[in-house]
A protein has these predicted regions:
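Short, cysteine-centered beta-strand-loop-beta hairpins and adjacent loop/turn segments enriched
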Residues: 101-110
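Residue-level signal for well-ordered, solvent-exposed loop/turn and beta-edge residues enriched
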Residues: 45, 107, 123-125
Length: 137
C-alpha cells in the first residue's frame, strides 16, 4: 500500500494514528466487514458519496453502516481503494485514494476520492465519503 508515517495526535485520551487509517483501508480492500466495523464507534455515522440527502445518503449506527458497506461489496465485488494517503489532526482525519471496481453489470469505475473522518474514543465516529463520478466502458 502507499507510504505513510506514524503521526500521533491526542484524541479523547486515545491515540489515533495514520496507521489506524491504513488498517481501516486494508480491511476495506480485504472486504473484511468484521475488521472494518472494529474501527467504528457503536454510534457511528456513514455519509455516502451519493444519495437523496444533501450530504449523500446517511447511515446511522453500526448495523446501518455495516449494511451500507456490505452493499458496496455487493455492487462492486472487486472494489479496491488504491494509493491511499492518510492524515490525522486531533479528532479529525482524512484519507485520499483511487477507487477501482466493476459493477455486477460490467460497468468499470476508476475515480479519485476521499474520506473525511471524525474520531471518538480512538475509533471512527463519522466517515463522510466523496468521490468523482466517472464511468469507464
Amino acid at each position: 500500500m502507499g507510504r505513510h508515517r506514524k503521526i500521533y495526535k491526542k484524541n479523547n485520551s486515545m491515540d489515533v494514528i495514520v496507521d489506524f487509517l491504513q488498517s481501516f483501508a486494508d480491511a476495506f480492500n480485504a472486504h473484511n466487514i468484521k475488521a472494518i466495523m472494529s474501527h467504528m464507534t457503536d454510534d457511528c455515522v456513514f455519509e455516502a458519496s451519493a444519495g437523496p440527502d444533501f450530504n449523500g445518503e446517511k447511515f446511522t449506527g453500526k448495523q446501518q453502516v455495516k449494511e451500507a458497506f456490505e452493499k458496496v461489496f455487493e455492487t462492486f465485488p472487486d472494489a479496491h481503494w488504491g494509493n491511499p494517503r492518510h492524515f490525522v489532526s486531533g479528532d479529525r482525519g482524512f484519507s485520499e485514494w483511487i477507487f477501482t471496481g466493476t459493477k455486477t453489470d460490467g460497468t468499470k469505475v476508476e475515480v479519485t476520492g476521499c474520506d473525511l473522518f471524525a474520531f471518538k474514543d480512538g475509533k471512527i465516529s463519522v466517515k463522510n465519503s466523496y468521490r468523482k463520478n466517472r464511468f469507464l466502458k
